[in-house]
């Protein structure tokens, strides 16, 4: 790394010469006065549109593997229940169970294509917001923008699935590696510690890809970790935790809206997720 690159990285982490408190105040003003929350609402809509085609794809794929698929499906739903609000995860669980029984190759292909297509519109919305944050106008042709959005969506899906696999089966993977290469118990203990930083690295990499390719920036340098990606991940984890705690003690959506309560809760969680992604982009800008 030459001195020029070192200066660029140092400048990035100096946050434009702003103190953290000043940066937080400026980011809040941008959120309050701008259209970030409106764009986050649009993202929640695209996330919801992409969710159920994605479930059709995943459950159809799992249905082709019978016993192993049943175990993996149960583990995925159990993990979703630990991250998403209870009512939202229950809605997803019910939908998955209804779809799984009729898994076919046609549903597999259709679900994958539909999930990628709808999710790519959400990626385009993220790009529009980041362009506004950086003060640039979209100049890429439509076909190129669609390809970038689809490619980003596919890459993020692969990263998220890999991270989930490590979360759900990290222990088994470590034991398998230790047994195959005769690495011993020390490796198992070390693996149990390092698998979580690896999962975090996958998530940060997903955010870094989004912030690098989604906006129309001509001469942007690549950074594995940025203040915005750290802010986005931390904020997403925080709002997910706070929302779960709130619903645990003050869940009135199901009482007020009946069966629609779970859908509303899922949309709110997607809304907060979209806002966290966009706030991270604002911090980088």
Predicted feature residues:
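Membrane-embedded alpha-helices and immediately adjacent juxtamembrane helical segments
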Residues: 1-285
């Amino acid at each position: 790394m030459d001195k020029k690159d070192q200066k660029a990285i140092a400048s990035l982490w100096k946050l434009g010469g702003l103190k953290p408190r000043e940066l937080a105040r400026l980011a809040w003003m941008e959120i309050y006065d701008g259209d970030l929350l409106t764009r986050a609402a649009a993202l929640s809509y695209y996330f919801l549109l992409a969710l159920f085609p994605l479930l059709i794809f995943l459950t159809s794929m799992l249905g082709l593997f019978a016993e192993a698929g049943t175990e993996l499906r149960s583990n995925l739903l159990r993990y979703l229940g630990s991250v998403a609000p209870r009512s939202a995860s229950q809605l997803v669980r019910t939908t998955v169970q209804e779809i799984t029984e009729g898994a076919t190759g046609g549903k597999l292909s259709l679900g994958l294509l539909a999930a990628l297509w709808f999710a790519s519109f959400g990626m385009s919305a993220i790009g529009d917001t980041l362009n506004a944050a950086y003060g640039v106008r979209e100049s890429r042709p439509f076909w190129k923008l669609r390809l970038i959005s689809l490619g980003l969506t596919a890459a993020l899906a692969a990263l998220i699935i890999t991270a989930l696999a490590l979360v759900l089966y990290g222990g088994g993977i470590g034991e398998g590696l230790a047994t195959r290469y005769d690495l011993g118990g020390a490796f198992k203990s070390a693996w149990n510690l390092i698998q979580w930083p690896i999962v975090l690295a996958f998530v940060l990499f997903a955010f870094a890809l989004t912030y690098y390719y989604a906006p129309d920036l001509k001469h942007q340098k690549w950074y594995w970790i940025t203040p915005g990606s750290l802010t986005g991940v931390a904020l997403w984890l925080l709002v997910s935790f706070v929302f779960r705690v709130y619903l645990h003690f003050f869940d009135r959506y199901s009482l007020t809206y009946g069966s629609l309560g779970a859908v509303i809760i899922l949309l709110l969680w997607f809304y907060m997720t979209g806002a966290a992604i966009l706030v991270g982009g604002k911090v980088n800008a």
